[in-house]
From Swiss-Prot:
Biased composition (Basic and acidic residues): 1-17
Stretches the record annotates as Disordered: 1-31
Main location: other
Function per UniProt: Acts as a GTPase-activating protein (GAP) for ARL2 with low specific activity.
Protein name as it appears in the record: ELMO domain-containing protein 3
Record Pfam families: ELMO_CED12
Subcellular location: Cell projection, Stereocilium; Cell projection, Kinocilium; Cytoplasm, Cytoskeleton
Domain ELMO, residue spans: 170-324
Amino acid sequence: MNENFHSFHEKELRDGQVESVSAGSSPPCDKDSSALLAFRGISISELKNHSVLQALTAEANAWEPRVVSTEVLQAQEEWEAVESIHPETGSRASMDQPGQLISFSEALQHFQTVDLSSFKKRIQPTIRRTGLAALRHYLFGPPKLHQGLREERDLVLTIAQCGLDSQDPMHGRVLQTIYKKLTGSKFDCALHGDHWEDLGFQGTNPATDLRGAGFLALLHLLYLVMDSKTLLMAREILRLSRHHIQQFPFCLMSVNITRIAIQALREECLSRECNRQQKVIPVVNSFYAATFLRLAHIWRTQHKTISDSGFVLKDLEMSAKKSPRRLLKTLETYLAGVSKGQASLLGTQKCSGPQAPHSKDLTFTGVCDLPSHLSEGTWLI
């Protein structure tokens, strides 16, 4: 009896749904209303797969929206935080669980708590100067870093000596977070594979491209993608890197920017700002982001290509070390504009094209690859 009732009730519902979208038995309505009525019988989980919705939401220029507001990025971060709560306990999932995003502060805390003594032995905190160079630096150079900040500086340089260990869960989570944030993917990816070339590494294993910057290069990328304002900047630079003429390997360029930040720290170019803020790591992070922003501006406005990379980076290094405070002010102005929805590196420029090659096919010259008379051989960390 109950089964007959339920089957009759279900038939009634099905008939009602059919009638509600039937042109012959419903009053005339516009196309939008018809589309809404057609979706009534579809579950929410299935809506994202519906062809009509996919057509409505598809971007005309392929891989991502041109402009994403900081409000949208913040909402995505809040939703990701909700997804990391266990429904049965209400507590956060284990931090070792695959798929968990990792914050910059959590990754940094890992390095603050593990034994790095074997790596610390390798660092050279400051540049050794002799003769007239030492006298000139003493008389006209920047101030010495405060004694209380030197341990923090040494930590930065020590992290730059650490390589990527694919067996370390924390290292894997950093890579996964960078990939997900830059691409918008919700799924884990392999730690080796062609997808890393798509993001601008020159090989399928990111560990092979960290020369001269170590794990600090990945921490800098993590810093860039874990804040909604700098994430917007990172995605714009990524779009520029995929321009059909001006393409460059995004992640490899980022590694070179980290090298510049390391060198600026060792040459004490950032000491004045570190002393003023009484911090080292936030200053180095901001200097990295500001330098990357400056590079993107030069690259776009001066129509640079991959063949210009080495000389652009060398000129950028010299100007950044000469006026770090001005560079940091530029970043502050840009991020303030992002908050108001008024800042954009690219505007309406179309940056992707079908002819853009993989990073491994580009001949990229980094700072370390310049002739010795240009690079001055100062890249020992």
